Amino acid sequence: MTTAARPTFEPARGGRGKGEGDLSQLSKQYSSRDLPSHTKIKYRQTTQDAPEEVRNRDFRRELEERERAAAREKNRDRPTREHTTSSSVSKKPRLDQIPAANLDADDPLTDEEDEDFEEESDDDDTAALLAELEKIKKERAEEQARKEQEQKAEEERIRMENILSGNPLLNLTGPSQPQANFKVKRRWDDDVVFKNCAKGIDDQKKDKRFVNDTLRSEFHKKFMEKYIK
């Protein structure tokens, strides 16, 4: 039987066993993570902004050199753009260079006339669009009103039909209405097999015969007459 569950009144203590006189010599194992890792100071190298290097640098001169280099780079691209702009401007014909033979009364001579013509055409287009928009709105409103009127008429017709069909007296008065049929509908169990099977048996001659029905058997009838009735 195990004794693991029993309480320990005398726990084990280190230093009392064989070779355990000195507790500091119990184990010679140690982890590599316990060793000293960073034992030397890291100094800044060249091009890492060391104090001596920063002290000997002339920041103003470096800034001026970078500005001059940026200006030279900008001026290098400027003549190309100016040349392309001048060439595009030179391609545009001037008004005084157009020969007199090409001048016509229908040709626009000023930009103001072009602007006036464009404004008039824009106004005409805006007016046409507004008129078309008003026409569309009017057609939609008429269509909506027509649908609402048809829906109301259909609802009224359905309501009148429900009123007339719900009252049998009103159905009889109408000449166009079909004749109402008050015949009682047959029950769902009118044609079942064992309905009214025992009806009229007492009037007939009682002969002992086998019936495949426990409720209509002779034994059941005698039992009911003897103990229940």
Curated annotation (Swiss-Prot):
The keyword Cytoplasm does not apply. It comes from the Eukaryota. The modification Phosphoserine is found at residue 121. Its main location: nucleus. Residues 52-84 have a biased composition (Basic and acidic residues). The modification N-acetylthreonine is found at residue 2. Keywords: Acetylation, Coiled coil, mRNA processing, mRNA splicing, Nucleus, Phosphoprotein, Spliceosome. GO terms for cellular component: catalytic step 2 spliceosome; nucleus; Prp19 complex; spliceosomal complex; U2-type catalytic step 2 spliceosome. Residues 123-165 form a coiled coil. The modification N6-acetyllysine is found at residue 18. GO terms for biological process: mRNA cis splicing, via spliceosome; mRNA splicing, via spliceosome. The modification Phosphothreonine is found at residues 47, 110. Residues 1-133 are annotated as: Disordered. Residues 24-34 have a biased composition (Polar residues). GO terms for molecular function: RNA binding. Pfam families: Cwf_Cwc_15. Residues 104-126 have a biased composition (Acidic residues). Identified in the spliceosome C complex. Component of the PRP19-CDC5L splicing complex composed of a core complex comprising a homotetramer of PRPF19, CDC5L, PLRG1 and BCAS2, and at least three less stably associated proteins CTNNBL1, CWC15 and HSPA8. Interacts directly with CTNNBL1 in the complex. Component of the minor spliceosome, which splices U12-type introns. Involved in pre-mRNA splicing as component of the spliceosome. Component of the PRP19-CDC5L complex that forms an integral part of the spliceosome and is required for activating pre-mRNA splicing. As a component of the minor spliceosome, involved in the splicing of U12-type introns in pre-mRNAs. Belongs to the CWC15 family. This is Spliceosome-associated protein CWC15 homolog.
